[in-house]
Amino acid sequence: MRLLTRSDFDGLVCAAILKGIGIVNEICYVHPKDVQDNKIKTTKNDVIANLPYVKDCKMWFDHHSSEIERLKLKGKIDGSIEPVDSAARVVFNYFKARKPYSQIVQKFEKLVNIADIVDSAKFTKADIMNPQGWTMLPFITDPHSNFGKKHTFSISNLQLLKTLPDLLCSKTADEILAMPDFMERVTAYKKDIKEYEKILLENSTVAGDAIVVDFRGMEHVPIGNRFLEYFLFPKQNISVRAVDGKNKKFVTISLGHSIINRTSEVDVGHLTLGYGGGGHKRAGACQVSYKDADTVIQEMLQIINNKNINYYSHRYTVHE
């Protein structure tokens, strides 16, 4: 069977488990919005993990609260959806409870624990300022780190990610990071991080509880760490980030709770669902047209700062 999943660390761990226990033999990385917009053709030969639900798939695993809210599917699907820290945890729990997989899946427990930490952003200051091992590897796979936009590596980011599920089954993080294609990215991260911090400060403003990061119109954003902003603005408890979408056809707006000041009560998945996106309580994203982006951002800031978390508008289009 084929697995459809995201190309972030959580999706990669889902892939490692499902391939490692013999459920899938092919892996395809797709964007969640393409799934929502029915741009991905699926069949009963497909397993979907860490992505929106598609009714004609064989099995589906997810943990995003927006999907629970959107579909009311618990108990009505082949697979599982749970509001836990990672989709990898959902996959692990499902097969741990089922023979003949209950024993073989146990070898992935440590990896799933790491996926929980990564996807729920339970990082320390040391993890962000000096990432190593199982912290550095997820940052390399994070789409927000901008590795995919740098075209001077020996192999593309997609080619690199295709190798990772098998590597996660057999090697430690340090062994993986010592491989040339990964070491190349570690070097690039260390080279770019100071420039990224400078550009981040130049393009960030504070709006009450929120850090607003606006990278729209920037042709080059250095490789960086999306959690750095929380250390630069420790009094704020949530970030709102705007970047150009693919081929500048739309604006992607991402929201995330601070990992330093964990006082935000905004349900980000619920909020972004109202704009055609999704996520879980602490993080999520949506895509809106350029003409609507400023209005959407201001509306989100009003919701965040007025604590009016039940309000959102459906007036906005995704693409111009």
PLM regions and their residue ranges:
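Active-site loops and adjacent core secondary-structure elements that bind or stabilize anionic groups
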Residues: 200
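Long, charge-rich alpha-helical interaction segments
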Residues: 143-183
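Short, surface-exposed loop/turn motifs that are enriched in glycine and acidic residues
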Residues: 182-190
